[in-house]
Amino acid sequence: MHSYDFALLLAFFVIVLLPAPWLGRFYYKVMEGQRTWLTPVLGPVEQGCYRLAGVNASQEQNWRQYTLALLAFNLVGFLLLFAVLLLQGYLPLNPQNLPGQEWSLAFNTAVSFVTNTNWQAYSGEASVSYLSQMLGLTVQNFVSPATGLAVLVVLCRGIARRSATTLGNFWVDMTRATLYGLLPLCLLLALLLVWQGVPQTFADYAHALTLQGADQTIPLGPAASQIAIKQLGTNGGGFFGVNSAHPFENPTAWSNLFEVASIILIPVALVFTFGHYVKDLRQSRAILACMLALFLIGGSTALWSEHQPNPALESTQVQQTAPLEGKESRFGTTGSVLWAVTTTAASNGSVNAMHDSLNPLTGMVAMVNMMVGEVIFGGVGAGLYGMLLFVLIAVFLAGLMIGRTPEYLGKKLQAREVQLLVATLLVMPVGVLVLGAIAASLPGPAGAVTNPGAHGFSQLLYAYTSGSANNGSAFAGFGANTVYHNLMIGLAMLIGRFGYILPILALAGSLAAKKSAPLGQNSFPTHGPLFTGLLLVTILLVGGLTFLPTLALGPIAEHLSLGF
């Protein structure tokens, strides 16, 4: 590694960590309706939205009403996006006259963007019109992270409130999350990207004559605005087929730094938002320490692995510094690994290098980041509510070990809460192991694998892990655009999204109804290094150990067989 690599890593952590406490407090004030510096500008817009939609902003909902509103909103969003993708050939803003997507691909794409996964079994510039990109995909890029943020806020209220029957208003939370939480930051990032050369235009694709005399089509479009929310909303779906490896999505080292840092900017800030809800920022610091520890362990492993020379070239005269297959030379190995680890630690899924070309252990780190439930920062809202589930599980295990009724911040965890926690633990195994095993055992679906042996199995394992974790990245050699995989990965995405959201909303309702006992000397502290260590071990054992046999058949076997 060179001095530039260390400067990149330092700048990344400074951009992410320095504004996090301030931004976390801002999100708390926004979601609770307190006045902020944006209120004079956006307050009238917010109130106008409520009047237009007929929403009574002062009327809160119980968890069942909140759940029904959330499901109805997401269902309507899915149907609208599905229709736009099917009918885009008949709709305006389609200068390339692209036809509508095939029905199973349209289903997969609509589910993907509604669930904040952004799995793409298509190439954007070749199959999606400008209107579909803006009216369909970009809209969901805003409302899907806003949904995750709303669910997180409900869980925070459930932990913080006492003897309460209501948890907020879904329509109010969605409006505030979108208007205050996402739009201003996206506007700023979009302007920075345009400054760096990312296109933002409605012009037709350009045509150029190459030096060889051939005609080349150069895709354009309103890219900067979608890329901004793609990164900040932990969406990840690229405007172009190769995502942020494309020079129009990510042209410079500066744009690369802005984009990779923006992936976890909001998820890190929301850790501090939780601390403001429970009036104890020590809880935030303990959770953030665990997240950073897991991130640094995975990142260090991936950097070491990816800087190893390829054993297959040792007998040749080729001088190896680091493997650059599948990477952009303008980003280098460290910039590519940093992105790969960050995008899988969050439920983002965007890429600036091809994950299918990563060394086996680097690919395994990416998979493990997803397999533990996307709790290492995770998606907007989704990452922290997933981490809080592990916090409650760790508290439950600690209670079993010391023979006391487990409680978290004065709220006792009883049978109903534990049952809901266990239900969430089944989400990833069902999506990855059950659906993945079925796909691997059927000759038709297994034919999507384009490599033999362990790496081929890793391709399939990565696909179903990515779908279940709502990540969206892929080993791109996997032939995902078949009716079977479009439907089954779509099912995995739905399980991975709503298999968490529904139990969490029920859990929030149950916790909110409880009284809060004052913390005493015998209470198990959840803000110190001991609990941080317990939480880390819980995540690795409960969340990760389940998948060790499949990892042994995939990336571990490949690593050993290649002689690294």
UniProtKB/Swiss-Prot annotation:
It comes from the Bacteria. One of its GO terms (molecular function) is P-type potassium transmembrane transporter activity. Keywords: Cell inner membrane, Cell membrane, Ion transport, Membrane, Potassium, Potassium transport, Transmembrane, Transmembrane helix, Transport. It is found in: Cell inner membrane. One of its GO terms (cellular component) is plasma membrane. The chain crosses the membrane at residues 4-24, 67-87, 135-155, 179-199, 258-278, 286-306, 382-402, 420-440, 487-507, 533-553. Pfam families: KdpA. InterPro entries: KdpA. It is a multi-pass membrane protein. NCBIfam families: kdpA (TIGR00680). The system is composed of three essential subunits: KdpA, KdpB and KdpC. Part of the high-affinity ATP-driven potassium transport (or Kdp) system, which catalyzes the hydrolysis of ATP coupled with the electrogenic transport of potassium into the cytoplasm. This subunit binds the periplasmic potassium ions and delivers the ions to the membrane domain of KdpB through an intramembrane tunnel. Belongs to the KdpA family. PANTHER family: POTASSIUM-TRANSPORTING ATPASE A CHAIN (PTHR30607), POTASSIUM-TRANSPORTING ATPASE POTASSIUM-BINDING SUBUNIT (PTHR30607:SF2). This is Potassium-transporting ATPase potassium-binding subunit. The gene is kdpA.
